[in-house]
From Swiss-Prot:
Keywords: Cell inner membrane, Cell membrane, Ion transport, Magnesium, Membrane, Transmembrane, Transmembrane helix, Transport. Its main location: membrane. Homopentamer. In the absence of Mg(2+), interactions between subunits are weakened, and dimers, trimers and tetramers can be observed in vitro. One of its GO terms (cellular component) is plasma membrane. The gene is corA. SUPFAM superfamilies: CorA soluble domain-like, Magnesium transport protein CorA, transmembrane region. It comes from Yersinia pestis. NCBIfam families: corA. This is Magnesium transport protein CorA.
Length: 316
């Protein structure tokens, strides 16, 4: 899908893209999973080459942040959750050339959707491509901060479940949720660090106006303040995982203890019963009139004696 926006009274206004000269008046050209015809239109009308899918997947810094004859290029991760609530990071290719911002992405992203909603009533200060880029990065950082807050809330709820000593099935669910929260935290951290590198590159390479330079530094300060919070999440997740595993081990030890008690109580009587159950001809006890009750009494004594002894020694 191809969308374009122009500046009207210092606000973004969406273009209908019916006329061939509409793109030439645009300030921001946004492409989401573009078809080949849309790529060709951008190339024909604006002379702009767009990144390919393999180029979006490159992770080395030289392929994500660079400047060439086609403009200033920044490839940056954006966080999203799909229809099944699975977290992921999607790469967005930003290009600034001739005062115009190009964005190429593979899916609709929450940060872009939120920014377009805000842009309807938001007045731009300078109304240039760099301001748009930094506004999108600001929106992304706000979204990541919200995700960190959500993880904190989820971990607080999990902490109560784990520390209150629930049943084994609830521990299994808690461990699964902890693994999911750790995965989300890792993706958020990856986004933060990637955005930090992108902004440092932008500050070094682009001749930013003073207002955008201060805006970039403000976003960098926000990232630096969020990274320690994100790191503390991993420590909290690790602590809760260890606590949950510890409680699971305690529960397993209780079960093993029950089997140990059963073994201590029933193994000696079983030995007595099996001894008198052997089919030998010369077993004098078999002819005794009190042989059966005597064997029963011996089995009871053989079961109680080791149990009481082990209990006194606190071995059970």
């Amino acid at each position: 899908m191809l969308s374009a926006f122009k500046l009207h009274n210092n606000r973004l206004s969406r273009l209908e893209l019916d006329e061939s000269d509409d793109l030439a008046s645009s300030l921001w050209v946004d492409l989401v999973e573009p078809e080949e015809g849309e790529r060709e239109r951008v190339q024909t009308e604006l002379g702009q080459s767009l990144a390919t899918r393999p180029e979006l997947d490159d992770i080395e810094a030289s392929a994500r942040f660079f400047e060439d004859e086609d403009g200033l290029h920044i490839h940056s991760f954006f966080y999203y959750e799909d229809a099944d609530d699975h977290a992921g990071n999607s790469t967005v290719a930003f290009t600034i050339r001739d005062g115009r911002l190009y964005t190429l992405r593979e899916r609709e992203l929450p940060a872009f959707r939120l920014y377009r909603m805000r842009a309807r009533n938001q007045t731009l200060v300078d109304g240039n491509a760099y301001e748009l880029l930094l506004d999108l990065f600001e929106t992304k950082i706000e979204q990541l901060a919200d995700e960190i807050e959500n993880i904190y809330s989820d971990l607080e709820a999990l902490s109560r479940v784990i520390m209150e000593g629930q049943q084994g099935d609830e521990y299994d669910a808690a461990l699964s949720t902890l693994a999911e929260q750790e995965d989300i935290g890792w993706k958020v951290r990856l986004c933060l660090m990637d955005t930090q590198r992108a902004l440092n590159f932008l500050v070094r390479k682009a001749r930013l106006p003073s207002s955008q330079l201060e805006q970039a530094r403000e976003v960098l300060r926000d990232i630096e303040s969020l990274l320690p919070h994100n790191e503390s999440l991993f420590q909290k997740v690790n602590f809760l995982m260890q606590a949950a595993m510890g409680f699971i081990n305690i529960e397993q030890n209780r079960i093993i203890k029950i089997f140990s008690v059963v073994s201590v109580v029933f193994l000696p009587p079983t030995l007595v019963a099996s001894s008198y159950g052997m089919n030998f001809e010369f077993m004098p006890e078999l002819r005794w009139s009190f042989g059966y009750p005597g064997a029963i009494a011996l089995m009871i004594i053989a079961g109680l004696a080791p149990y009481l002894y082990f209990k006194r020694k606190n071995w059970l």
